[in-house]
């Protein structure tokens, strides 16, 4: 887990920090600082959320200098409108439509590790195409409580099936050079009481 605060006296630029949206890949969950690249050769890491494939902003615009323009962000399930002053003459429009894959428990019902591995490979290739380094998935929690609002993300109530599914999709993603997963929600994410004041990360 990367946490921290940018110090202006230590670095010469202020890139996105974990928890903010990425300015490098619109709609990505966040990115780490690229400030160490000039001195140490350490690239920043761009992370995109799951769980049904990559979750990125499908449409975005930049000005002619390449600066991201506001609009297109998902707000309340709908994309925010672009300012009508953005025309083809003063802005460029980009599209990054990602494949929507079935959710975890649907994939687990296939009983096919080969299928899950091929789905992982598809996700890894899309990560490469859109410049994403880490996929914030798969979700490996088990179905402990039928009232859990996030059971759809998890593979099964059976830990063996869940582990086999997560391993297969991980193999697929990581078969693509430089791409990785962040298996998450090992425990306590199924708690519905006091949900907004607990931390399962």
Language-model segments: which ranges?
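Glycoside hydrolase catalytic-domain context in secreted enzymes
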Residues: 1-201
């Amino acid at each position: 887990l990367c946490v921290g605060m940018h110090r202006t006296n230590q670095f010469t630029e202020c890139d996105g920090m974990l928890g903010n949206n990425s300015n490098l890949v619109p709609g990505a969950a966040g990115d780490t600082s690229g400030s160490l690249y000039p001195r140490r050769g350490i690239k920043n890491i761009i992370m995109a959320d799951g769980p049904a494939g990559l979750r990125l902003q499908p449409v975005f615009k930049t000005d002619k200098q390449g600066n991201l323009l506001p609009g297109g962000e998902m707000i309340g399930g709908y994309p925010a409108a672009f300012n009508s002053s953005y025309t083809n003459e003063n802005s460029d429009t980009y599209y990054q439509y990602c494949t929507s894959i079935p959710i975890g428990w649907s994939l687990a019902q296939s009983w096919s590790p080969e299928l899950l591995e091929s789905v992982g490979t598809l996700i890894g290739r899309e990560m490469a195409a859109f410049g994403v380094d880490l996929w914030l998935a798969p979700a490996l929690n088990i179905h402990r409580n039928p009232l859990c609002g996030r059971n759809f993300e998890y593979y099964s109530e059976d830990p063996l099936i869940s582990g086999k599914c997560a391993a297969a999709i991980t193999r697929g993603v990581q078969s693509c050079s430089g791409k990785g997963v962040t298996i998450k929600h090992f425990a306590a994410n199924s708690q519905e009481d006091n949900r907004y004041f607990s931390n399962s990360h």
